[in-house]
Amino acid sequence: MIDIKEIREALPHRYPMLLVDRVLEVSEDEIVAIKNVSINEPFFNGHFPEYPVMPGVLIMEALAQTAGVLELSKEENKGKLVFYAGMDKVKFKKQVVPGDQLVMTAKFVKRRGTIAVVEAIAEVDGKLAASGTLTFAIGN
């Protein structure tokens, strides 16, 4: 398990853009993390005031940060940054609303130099909320 202190050491993101609360499981190429979605999230003020829904792009950002924790917690990548390079095959299947716990899984499927490709899913209560293939670059 990786707690919020270690997550903050790995990622440069801070409130309100830090979207990973805790890592539950981690291996060499796979990670499972959670985001507890609260009504106090700033994006709910405008998306949407009468029917708050977590924006899909922020779900994908949370998945990218999850993969980033895995990559940036490795000794050889300490102090580096992870940059989004693309998204493919993104699908949104279930709305994420206040009170939900987003369970995010990212698995590395390909690496070439400083470029990595990740298959990622986000679930709520065991149901698929979003999925996609994320590409990112590791840099200084």
UniProtKB/Swiss-Prot annotation:
Keywords: Cytoplasm, Lipid A biosynthesis, Lipid biosynthesis, Lipid metabolism, Lyase. GO terms for biological process: fatty acid biosynthetic process; lipid A biosynthetic process. The keyword Amino-acid biosynthesis does not apply. InterPro entries: FabA_FabZ (IPR013114), FabZ (IPR010084), HotDog_dom_sf (IPR029069). Pfam families: FabA. CDD domains: FabZ. It catalyses: a (3R)-hydroxyacyl-[ACP] = a (2E)-enoyl-[ACP] + H2O. GO terms for cellular component: cytoplasm; membrane. It comes from the Bacteria. Its EC number is 4.2.1.59. It is found in: Cytoplasm. The active site is at 47. It is an enzyme of class 4 (lyase). One of its GO terms (molecular function) is (3R)-hydroxyacyl-[acyl-carrier-protein] dehydratase activity. Involved in unsaturated fatty acids biosynthesis. Catalyzes the dehydration of short chain beta-hydroxyacyl-ACPs and long chain saturated and unsaturated beta-hydroxyacyl-ACPs. Belongs to the thioester dehydratase family. FabZ subfamily. HAMAP family: FabZ. This is 3-hydroxyacyl-[acyl-carrier-protein] dehydratase FabZ. It comes from Streptococcus agalactiae serotype V (strain ATCC BAA-611 / 2603 V/R).
